[in-house]
Design a protein with these regions (language model features):
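Generic protein-terminus/edge-of-domain signal
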Residues: 1-65, 85, 108, 112-115
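A short, acidic/glycine-rich surface segment
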Residues: 30-37, 80-81, 102, 164
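Short acidic-glycine-tyrosine-enriched beta hairpin
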Residues: 62-76
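A short, Lys/Arg-enriched amphipathic alpha-helix from helix-turn-helix/homeodomain DNA-binding modules
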Residues: 121-133, 146-147, 163-178
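Hydrophobic recognition helices of helix-based DNA-binding modules
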Residues: 135, 154-157, 161
Length: 178
């Protein structure tokens, strides 16, 4: 398994704070046949998974998450998901907490349901990679920048989801021809 992870050392899940990014990472299976995660009692924070390549399996209710899908897990919810080497998955994940967490997910239509298709965009990967780097290096202001990048990620996913649901919005990007 190859991974790049960043942890907000000293950041404890404090739901009373507005938004705190606790950890973020990127998995790619190289040799391990199956990476299986089971958390019977869940975690005390929120989690968002994004399938950047191939697929992940979220049994029993979630089914298979394919490229371009995101899966959200609320606090204390049981978790059971796995990735298989033969499917060559590439997954980004982030754990977060705070008073605004649920509201941000709901605002962009990413709260209800276990998973939803948000498409493939380089912007998502850049947001994840920047958050990972900030958590690894921890320069001054890293927590605030991580929260801002995460909000950008959610906004981008929510906006893309709206475009996919409503074809009339697909052309709402500004196009400049020279």
């Amino acid at each position: 398994t190859w991974s790049a992870c960043g942890y907000g050392d000293g950041c404890s899940p404090e739901p009373e704070k507005e938004l705190t990014i606790l950890s973020c990472g990127h998995y790619r299976l190289l040799r391990l046949e199956k990476l299986h995660t089971v958390r019977i009692q869940g975690r005390r924070d929120w989690q968002l998974l994004y399938v950047a390549k191939a697929r992940a399996t979220f049994p029993p209710a979630g089914g298979a998450g394919k490229t371009g899908e995101r899966c959200g897990v609320s606090p204390w919810r049981a978790q059971d998901y796995f990735y298989l080497l033969k499917e060559a998955p590439e997954i980004y994940w982030i754990h977060f907490t705070g008073e605004r967490a649920e509201g941000l997910l709901e605002e962009w239509g990413l709260f209800h349901g276990h998973s939803c298709f948000v498409g493939e965009q380089d912007r998502y990967l850049r947001c994840f990679e920047e958050i990972i780097q900030e958590l690894q290096l921890q320069p001054p202001g890293f927590q605030r920048l991580c929260a801002l990048r995460f909000e950008e990620l959610l906004l981008s996913m929510g906006r893309q989801r709206l475009r996919l649901k409503n074809p009339q919005l697909a052309g709402d990007s500004l196009v400049i021809q020279v």
